[in-house]
Amino acid sequence: MKPDSIPSLDECRALIYRYSMRPNIIEHSMRVMDVSLAITDNLVPGTRIDRDLVAAASLLHDITKTRSLETKERHDVSGARLLRELGYLRVADIVEQHVFFRDFSPGGALEEREIVYYADKRVMHNAIVT
Protein backbone atom coordinates (compact mmCIF):
# COMPACT_ATOMS: atom_id res chain seq x y z
CA MET A 1 0.00 0.00 0.00
CA LYS A 2 1.35 3.42 -0.88
CA PRO A 3 1.37 6.06 1.86
CA ASP A 4 -1.92 7.91 2.24
CA SER A 5 -3.88 5.59 0.00
CA ILE A 6 -7.66 5.48 0.01
CA PRO A 7 -9.15 2.04 0.72
CA SER A 8 -11.44 0.58 -1.93
CA LEU A 9 -15.01 -0.33 -1.01
CA ASP A 10 -13.90 -3.97 -0.67
CA GLU A 11 -11.05 -2.93 1.63
CA CYS A 12 -13.49 -0.83 3.67
CA ARG A 13 -15.80 -3.81 4.05
CA ALA A 14 -12.88 -5.98 5.16
CA LEU A 15 -11.93 -3.38 7.80
CA ILE A 16 -15.53 -3.15 8.97
CA TYR A 17 -15.57 -6.88 9.67
CA ARG A 18 -11.99 -7.02 10.95
CA TYR A 19 -12.83 -4.47 13.63
CA SER A 20 -16.18 -6.09 14.47
CA MET A 21 -18.53 -3.20 13.81
CA ARG A 22 -22.03 -3.99 15.02
CA PRO A 23 -24.63 -4.56 12.28
CA ASN A 24 -26.57 -1.42 13.24
CA ILE A 25 -23.40 0.68 13.04
CA ILE A 26 -22.58 -0.85 9.65
CA GLU A 27 -26.06 0.00 8.43
CA HIS A 28 -25.71 3.57 9.72
CA SER A 29 -22.35 3.92 7.96
CA MET A 30 -23.82 2.64 4.71
CA ARG A 31 -26.62 5.22 4.90
CA VAL A 32 -24.07 7.95 5.60
CA MET A 33 -22.24 6.84 2.47
CA ASP A 34 -25.49 6.94 0.48
CA VAL A 35 -26.18 10.52 1.59
CA SER A 36 -22.56 11.60 1.09
CA LEU A 37 -22.45 10.21 -2.43
CA ALA A 38 -25.85 11.69 -3.30
CA ILE A 39 -24.45 15.09 -2.34
CA THR A 40 -21.17 14.48 -4.16
CA ASP A 41 -22.88 13.27 -7.32
CA ASN A 42 -25.15 16.31 -7.45
CA LEU A 43 -22.57 19.05 -7.01
CA VAL A 44 -22.08 21.76 -9.58
CA PRO A 45 -19.89 20.41 -12.39
CA GLY A 46 -16.27 21.30 -11.79
CA THR A 47 -16.47 21.05 -8.00
CA ARG A 48 -13.30 19.27 -6.92
CA ILE A 49 -14.31 16.47 -4.57
CA ASP A 50 -12.63 13.06 -4.35
CA ARG A 51 -15.60 10.67 -4.55
CA ASP A 52 -13.52 7.66 -3.43
CA LEU A 53 -12.33 9.57 -0.36
CA VAL A 54 -15.91 10.55 0.52
CA ALA A 55 -17.10 6.94 0.15
CA ALA A 56 -14.28 5.46 2.24
CA ALA A 57 -14.52 8.08 5.00
CA SER A 58 -18.29 7.63 5.15
CA LEU A 59 -18.03 3.87 5.53
CA LEU A 60 -15.21 4.05 8.09
CA HIS A 61 -16.23 7.08 10.15
CA ASP A 62 -17.46 4.83 13.01
CA ILE A 63 -14.79 2.10 12.62
CA THR A 64 -14.02 2.02 16.38
CA LYS A 65 -17.48 2.92 17.68
CA THR A 66 -18.30 -0.67 18.69
CA ARG A 67 -15.25 -0.96 20.94
CA SER A 68 -15.73 2.58 22.25
CA LEU A 69 -19.08 1.55 23.69
CA GLU A 70 -17.07 -0.56 26.16
CA THR A 71 -13.87 1.46 26.49
CA LYS A 72 -15.62 4.87 26.58
CA GLU A 73 -12.89 6.24 24.31
CA ARG A 74 -13.79 8.92 21.77
CA HIS A 75 -14.44 6.91 18.64
CA ASP A 76 -13.59 9.82 16.36
CA VAL A 77 -10.10 10.04 17.88
CA SER A 78 -9.48 6.29 18.15
CA GLY A 79 -10.84 5.69 14.65
CA ALA A 80 -8.55 8.35 13.21
CA ARG A 81 -5.57 6.88 15.09
CA LEU A 82 -6.31 3.40 13.74
CA LEU A 83 -6.69 4.63 10.17
CA ARG A 84 -3.44 6.61 10.41
CA GLU A 85 -1.66 3.47 11.59
CA LEU A 86 -3.06 1.68 8.54
CA GLY A 87 -1.77 4.45 6.24
CA TYR A 88 -5.12 6.05 5.39
CA LEU A 89 -4.15 9.58 6.40
CA ARG A 90 -6.75 11.60 4.49
CA VAL A 91 -9.53 9.24 5.56
CA ALA A 92 -8.27 9.55 9.16
CA ASP A 93 -8.46 13.35 9.03
CA ILE A 94 -12.12 13.18 8.00
CA VAL A 95 -12.97 10.52 10.59
CA GLU A 96 -11.35 12.63 13.31
CA GLN A 97 -13.66 15.55 12.45
CA HIS A 98 -16.98 13.79 11.99
CA VAL A 99 -18.04 14.56 15.59
CA PHE A 100 -16.37 17.92 16.27
CA PHE A 101 -15.73 19.88 13.10
CA ARG A 102 -12.82 22.33 13.17
CA ASP A 103 -11.51 25.15 11.04
CA PHE A 104 -14.69 25.71 9.05
CA SER A 105 -14.51 28.49 6.48
CA PRO A 106 -17.99 29.43 5.17
CA GLY A 107 -16.51 31.20 2.15
CA GLY A 108 -14.03 28.47 1.32
CA ALA A 109 -14.23 25.68 -1.22
CA LEU A 110 -16.34 22.66 -0.28
CA GLU A 111 -14.29 19.82 1.21
CA GLU A 112 -14.84 16.09 1.58
CA ARG A 113 -14.83 16.39 5.37
CA GLU A 114 -17.78 18.79 5.22
CA ILE A 115 -19.81 16.36 3.13
CA VAL A 116 -19.18 13.41 5.48
CA TYR A 117 -19.82 15.54 8.58
CA TYR A 118 -23.12 16.81 7.19
CA ALA A 119 -24.23 13.38 5.97
CA ASP A 120 -23.53 11.85 9.39
CA LYS A 121 -25.77 14.45 10.98
CA ARG A 122 -28.55 13.65 8.47
CA VAL A 123 -28.55 9.92 9.35
CA MET A 124 -29.99 8.86 12.70
CA HIS A 125 -29.33 5.17 13.20
CA ASN A 126 -30.27 3.98 9.69
CA ALA A 127 -32.88 6.62 8.83
CA ILE A 128 -32.30 9.78 6.85
CA VAL A 129 -33.65 12.73 8.83
CA THR A 130 -34.21 16.40 8.10
Regions found by a protein language model. Give the residues of each.
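A positional/architectural concept
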Residues: 14-20, 24-44, 55
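Short alpha-helical hairpin
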Residues: 1-13
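Divalent metal-dependent catalytic cores for phosphoryl transfer on phosphate-bearing substrates
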Residues: 16-19, 44-130
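Short acidic/polar alpha-helix capping motifs at helix-coil junctions
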Residues: 2-4, 41-46
